[in-house]
Amino acid sequence: MATTIPTTATATMCPSPPVPTISPLLRTTHQCQPSPSLSSPFSIKLSTALVCGDTTVDRVVDSSVMIKPEKWGIQSEKRRKRRRRRRVGYERLEPEEEENAGVEAEAETISVPVVGASRSGFLSRLEEVQLCLYLKEGAKLENLGTSVEENEMVSVLLASGRGKKKRSANEILCRRKEAREKITRCYRRLVVSIATGYQGKGLNLQDLIQEGSIGLLRGAERFDPDRGYKLSTYVYWWIKQAILRAIAHKSRLVKLPGSMWELTAKVAEASNVLTRKLRRQPSCEEIAEHLNLNVSAVRLAVERSRSPVSLDRVASQNGRMTLQEIVRGPDETRPEEMVKREHMKHEIEQLLGSLTARESRVLGLYFGLNGETPMSFEEIGKSLKLSRERVRQINGIALKKLRNVHNVNDLKIYYSSSE
């Protein structure tokens, strides 16, 4: 260790007994040997000389020309705090422990620090422009054919279509591949920082990062450096749009239209705002008033936002009954409804018994009481060989008789229960 001490002349080193070194970790002793002074432009300018030797070290220690330990402690504490702040990104992105070692290795490559867009890129303006130009040229060549692999005929056609030589076309395609890899690697932190804000919405973090990387490359192909913006500023919105579309299309078993997904997102956000404001769960009317929408639209959005439930889900505490055994299908009828229909059919038969056979027949055909399809007066007349007007008169007389029957009010019970 070399230490600088002020002196006016060249230091003279003399033999001395062995002394311990300044480092406590080194348990050896050194014999002080005469050594010439080491001069440098820095020492000459400041009238100092660089002297090495254990005796010089002792003199420096005795004269207290050392940096105080307190200062080193403060700087070390500051460095530790900065490392802890940077390590927060790793902790937030820590994936769930998997038993498969391959999954853990893949997750470790994704756990990168979450930083802002200003620190995510390591490319200069010139590099951004060059890489984006490679992407644009490669995209134009790729649009001329469906395959850009090692096919001589395809390479010739692509080159002739763009008015370029075969060699230059292959170079552009290779540069495009390299540019995609470099942009994806340099702006990965920006993609991760955006993707972490959309966790817990149906897709895991790895899928969100993958979709964000696709949006990053799409935005880079359409980047225009003449506008004066940085690439990170432009692709931010492409990354966000790609992630939102992926959540809308891939996060649910039953896909929702884009407009309905946007409406459900607005309703969910308004519900959270009103919950914090009112300190309770808001109603559909309050959400509709907050968003200036119809109550029916809000209720529809709430229904569509519910996650699907498996029919194999256990519905009882003992675990012996599932939802499939409880929920009825569209063609199934509950036992209570079957009993109600039988009672109502019996009441109607008693009412029709107070009429004549022709009147009962006309009412049955007109209203479809016996499970038949309702018919018009003209169709009933053709069936009974009567005129249309006569059938209408018979129907009116039969209804007038039924209104005067004492037990006609018993049917109102079934009518009110059906509502």
From Swiss-Prot:
GO terms for biological process: cellular response to light stimulus; DNA-templated transcription initiation; regulation of RNA biosynthetic process. One of its GO terms (cellular component) is chloroplast. GO terms for molecular function: DNA binding; sigma factor activity. SUPFAM superfamilies: Sigma2 domain of RNA polymerase sigma factors, Sigma3 and sigma4 domains of RNA polymerase sigma factors. InterPro entries: RNA_pol_sigma-70_dom, RNA_pol_sigma70, RNA_pol_sigma70_r2, RNA_pol_sigma70_r3, RNA_pol_sigma70_r4, RNA_pol_sigma_r2, RNA_pol_sigma_r3/r4-like, RNA_pol_sigma_SigB/C/D/F. Mostly expressed in leaves, and to a lesser extent in roots. Present in seedlings. Residues 377-396 bind DNA. Induction: Slightly induced by blue light, especially after dark adaptation. It is found in: Plastid, Chloroplast. The keyword Chloroplast applies. It comes from the Eukaryota. Residues 1-52 form a transit peptide. The keyword Protein biosynthesis does not apply. A motif (Polymerase core binding) lies at residues 207-220. Disruption phenotype: Reduced transcription of the plastid ndhF gene. Keywords: Chloroplast, DNA-binding, Plastid, Sigma factor, Transcription, Transcription regulation, Transit peptide. Sigma factors are initiation factors that promote the attachment of plastid-encoded RNA polymerase (PEP) to specific initiation sites and are then released. Regulates transcription of the ndhF gene which codes for a subunit of the plastid NDH [NAD(P)H dehydrogenase] complex. NCBIfam families: sigma70-ECF. Belongs to the sigma-70 factor family. This is RNA polymerase sigma factor sigD, chloroplastic. It comes from Arabidopsis thaliana.
